[in-house]
Amino acid sequence: SQIGNTPLVRLKQASELTKCNIYGKAEYFNPGESVKDRAALYMINSAMENNKIEKGGTVIEGTAGNTGIGLAVVCKEYGLKLKVVMPNTQSEEKKITLKNLGAELIEVDAVPYSNSNNYVKLSKKIAADLSKENNHGVFWANQFDNLDNTKAHIETTAEEIWKQTAGKIDGF
């Protein structure tokens, strides 16, 4: 996979100001140019390993951007369809990127989470409705509550940082 194994970059000004070596993880080297690519890959791999979805299946997610882009990168590679439910207030650049990566956009009004028409709640409903008619599986990524989102960083990002620093870390 082209996702992960990103370099550490020493942040010169922060290091000089603190008299410590401060590093940042250059996640912009991922194909979707974001740390969210890791979470997307991990969530999709887990869903496939647990037979929640297979090639030809559909991933649904409510997202305002970067997780959707990460999912689009992974779905395109794995032969999965992606439907992204997003607030219509998002930038045209994000929308174009998602469409260019093959995602189907479902734009909705931006409303509070408490509203039943919130983009996250609508994505859950769409996934439930679609699962009744899809033979290859429908996977609601559910990034906000999906523990694989966090595990991605425990099992990949943290491991990489540990190796790249030879275990010499004073703070995280």
Question: Predicted segment positions?
Answer:
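PLP-dependent amino-acid enzyme catalytic core
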Residues: 1-172
